[in-house]
Amino acid sequence: MFVDQVKVYVKGGDGGNGMVAFRREKYVPKGGPAGGDGGNGADVVFEVDEGLRTLMDFRYKRHFKADRGEHGMSKNQHGRNAEEMIVKVPPGTVVTDAETEQVLADLTEHGQRAVIAKGGRGGRGNSRFATPANPAPQLSENGEPGKERDVILELKVLADVGLVGFPSVGKSTLLSIVSSAKPKIADYHFTTLVPNLGVVETDDNRSFVMADLPGLIEGAHEGVGLGHQFLRHIERTRVIVHVIDMSALEGRDPYEDYVTINEELEQYNMRLTERPQIIVANKMDMPDAADNLAAFKEKLTDDYKVFPISAITREGLRELLFEIANQLETTPEFPLYNEEELSDNRVMYRFDEGDAPFEITRDPDGTFVITGKALERLFKMTDFSRDESVKRFSRQLRGMGVDDALRERGAQDGDIIRLLEFEFEFID
């Protein structure tokens, strides 16, 4: 089964907790704090494996949770960092954040990697908090939570040339003749439901990858006839070969077919109309095909070359393949997204924008509810079993302006404040 889109959940590993410990040795009174830091949580890294062809594996495993870092230990021993979690994806995979729709990575080359969910930093042990005023601190940090998100994986096939056209115009037959590909061929519409790739070699030893893309119909750019799934595979192609049935046995006018498909490409955007297009007048061995071709050329206003062929008799194929190879030599690649160039094995990570400021709302029962990524991160990294940690958390809230904001909202002594699952009283 060919799977080209799937939604998965990824979570970086949490950082290990820091430790509260003190040096206890004979003849060393008041040895001081000796709690080690926690290790960093593991990143979730997507890596391209050229041996994969579809996203089929993700249909059976959709949750990827990396390991957390090791906790800190006594004697200032730091916890071990967790090893990154490698998730293999096929070439041509585009990773998009499901919530923000931001493209996180476009993975095209073997070995290319992208950090999709960053692991959390390890919490600091109590030796990190020692000061002249507090030489024996009784506080440490919990590990930072790892980044978690839902992402959408889309596979957009890597091909130099894309065959487009209405269903049953002979695209699969053409690919099977000029390459060793074996697409399904039958006398009904939408026989091809997944892209088929084939390597084509010309008589002068030039080669390229050709993709037989499922047939398009009017409204494809809006998703009609699975149009979105089909059109995404054209995005990476450098040359579009537009196959038209000149026999008109389906009862459609060849020129109207041509106009309709080009309108769909234009509406879909992704700069598809900027690519060179070669028109292939197929089924020239059929009756009335020559007359239909003459009428087609009279109506054609675009400056595209038209190649009359018969995929069955192989008439005109040599000239067509030479023209495709010539166009590829002069046509650059069309990048899908404006991204920095990445070396094959470089790990890329797009940092999020700064944490949003906190927000304060009030429930019907009068409870003030505080939300915000920065505050929630501090909360999760606080060890509420230790008084010093709680006092530090209160100071952090005050320093961020939470107390003043609560007063402005009308908070008074004794009012209940909620942050995640933690409730406390407001003291003015």
From Swiss-Prot:
Pfam (any one): MMR_HSR1
Please list the residue ranges annotated as the OBG-type G domain.
159-329
**Keyword Ribonucleoprotein carried by entry:** no
List the subcellular locations: Cytoplasm
Q: What is its EC number?
A: 3.6.5.-
Q: Which PROSITE patterns match?
A: G_OBG (PS51710), GTP1_OBG (PS00905), OBG (PS51883), OCT (PS51881)
Stretches assigned to the Obg domain: 1-158
Q: Any idea where the OCT domain is?
A: 350-428
Q: Major place of localization?
A: cytoplasm
**What are the GO BP annotations of this UniProt entry?**
ribosome biogenesis
Tell me one GO molecular function of this protein. Answer: magnesium ion binding
Q: How does it assemble?
A: Monomer.
This chain's protein is named GTPase Obg
Originating gene: obg
